[in-house]
Regions:
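Juxtamembrane intracellular "pre-TM" segments in multi-pass secondary transporters
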Residues: 173-205
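Conserved MFS/SLC helix-loop-helix module at the cytosolic interface between two early adjacent transmembrane helices
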Residues: 50-86
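C-terminal membrane-cytosol helix-exit motif in multi-pass small-molecule transporters
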Residues: 160-178, 367-375
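Short amphipathic helix-loop junctions that connect adjacent transmembrane helices
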Residues: 20-34, 218-233
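Helix-to-loop junctions at the C-terminal end of transmembrane segments
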Residues: 52-63, 249-262, 348
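Cytoplasmic helix-loop-helix junction between adjacent transmembrane helices
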Residues: 94-131
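Helix-loop-helix hairpin linking two adjacent transmembrane segments in secondary transporters
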Residues: 127-170, 353-354
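Cytoplasmic membrane-interface "Motif A"-like loop-to-helix N-cap segments
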Residues: 61-71, 258-271
Length: 441
């Protein structure tokens, strides 16, 4: 899982490394306005959002590795365009091409494919925490790299690392078994996902989370320069302590959610903390203490939700549509980044810094209300059975019989693989009955 986490971190770093310095750098590009700066920051998210679902579906049907490698190539190309941009329009193009390599869904689905159910929640949380860890490093390393090689140098660096990652992908990563059958159609796959209310609530949540985060960083670097007088290369001195404290503070709450099955309560608490952080940034931005406390609360809650949400999506997703479900989730995540950059830039240009934080607080309150109206998620376990060679007709009949076993909520039999993929409620599962159909994997 370390390699997948590293590739995911590289892709996320393409967004996060420039977050703390991009607003400062983009002000030097020809043709810039606050709105276009925000659009350039969020353009990465728009193409990610448009292509996550197709890439997730393709990874279900044609394999994870080719999709991941193709996405890394697009990311490298976009990095070259952004590195050589002298006009804000070219920068927007480069960021859009970077985002076209929409591999987050394929990576998360591969993690699910390569881990057993009893370890899957931990693996998903670990990859989710990689985002938080990348966030920590990016906000510290980004300003330092800005001082050493500039923002263009950061783009060159991440593009080169993407090429290295392709070689590592084929050299070291096992090829996962493809779960989805090639005969299923796109409309049916995504119809099942889009009718699931709990999955849609998680999609809405990750949209708001990344909208808020990206909008904040349209104005936050400018506030630090204006109010604290810190040059861009020195912003790491603010981010390092608050990120470390925030990251460590979230761990006990993540453990509580998983061990005590208090997912909704922990999520609601984290959202409330995010909203409080926005208010502190409105009223306390003129002082070092106000900024530090607000940012610490924000990063603690952000890291917690980034670790919690993808694990919930994987466990709630239909058995044979993990790539599709995570594709919808990832699309919402990156669409939020695009919306946040665009709205942040627009509000900054029209109404100033405070308007951005008030907008973010309002969005978070709406998310909190949504979470409080939903029941505690009913998380099912995944289970695989080796059922031997099956014709398509036999596979369909076997899936129907398996679905009637007490405790089996869903059954998908892939004839060409000789495998049955189940969603089960372990508390009521009739294990002896299930063993009659084949050996568990």
């Amino acid at each position: 899982m370390a390699l997948l986490a590293s590739i995911y971190a590289l892709r996320i770093a393409g967004l996060f490394l420039i977050l703390p310095v991009f607003a400062l750098f983009a002000g030097e590009l020809a043709g810039h306005t606050p709105l276009l700066i925000g659009l350039a920051l969020g353009a990465y998210g728009l193409t990610q959002a448009l292509l996550q679902i197709p890439f997730g579906w393709l990874s279900d049907h044609y394999g994870r590795k080719p999709v991941i490698a193709g996405g890394l190539l697009l990311f490298a190309l976009g990095s070259v365009i952004a590195a050589t941009a002298s006009h804000i329009g070219i920068m927007i193009l480069g960021r859009a091409v970077q985002g076209a390599g929409a591999i987050a869904a394929a990576i998360m689905a591969t993690v699910a494919d390569l881990t057993r159910e009893e370890q899957r929640a931990k693996a998903m949380a670990a990859v989710g925490m990689t985002i938080g860890g990348t966030f920590v490093l990016s906000l510290v390393v980004g300003p330092l790299l800005h001082g050493l090689i500039g923002v263009p140098g950061i783009f060159w660096l991440t593009g080169a690392l993407a090429i290295v990652a392709i070689g590592a992908l084929y050299r070291f990563l096992p090829t996962p078994v493809r779960v989805a059958a090639g005969r299923r159609d796109l409309r049916r796959d995504f119809g099942r996902i889009l009718r699931n209310r709990q999955l849609l609530a998680l999609d809405a949540g990750i949209f708001v989370l990344h909208l808020v985060m990206t909008a904040m960083f349209v104005v936050l670097p400018l506030i630090i320069v204006r109010e604290l007088g810190l040059a861009g290369a020195d912003h790491w001195a603010i981010y390092l302590p608050v990120m470390l404290v925030g990251f460590l503070a979230m761990v006990p709450f993540l453990v509580l959610a998983n061990r005590r099955h208090r997912h909704r309560a922990v999520m609601a608490g984290a959202i409330a903390v995010l909203a409080l952080a926005q208010l502190l940034l409105v009223f306390g931005q003129q002082s070092l203490y106000g900024l530090v406390i607000g940012l610490t609360l924000f990063f603690a809650a952000f890291s917690l939700l980034e670790a919690q949400l993808p694990s919930l999506v994987s466990r709630l997703a239909p058995a044979a549509n993990k790539g599709a479900a995570i594709g919808v989730y990832s699309s919402a995540q990156f669409l939020g980044a695009f919306a946040g950059g665009t709205l942040g830039g627009l509000l900054h240009g029209v109404a100033g810094f405070d308007a951005v934080f008030w907008m973010a607080a309002g969005m978070l309150v709406l998310w909190l209300v949504l979470v409080l109206t939903l029941p505690e998620p009913q998380l099912l376990a995944s289970h695989q059975i080796n059922v031997g060679n099956q014709s398509p007709g036999q596979a369909a009949r076997l899936a129907e019989r398996l679905s009637r076993v007490p405790g089996v909520a869903e059954a998908v039999v892939v004839a060409e693989e000789g495998m049955a993929y189940l969603k089960i409620d372990a508390r009521v599962l009739d294990k002896k009955h299930l063993e009659q159909f084949g050996s568990s994997v």
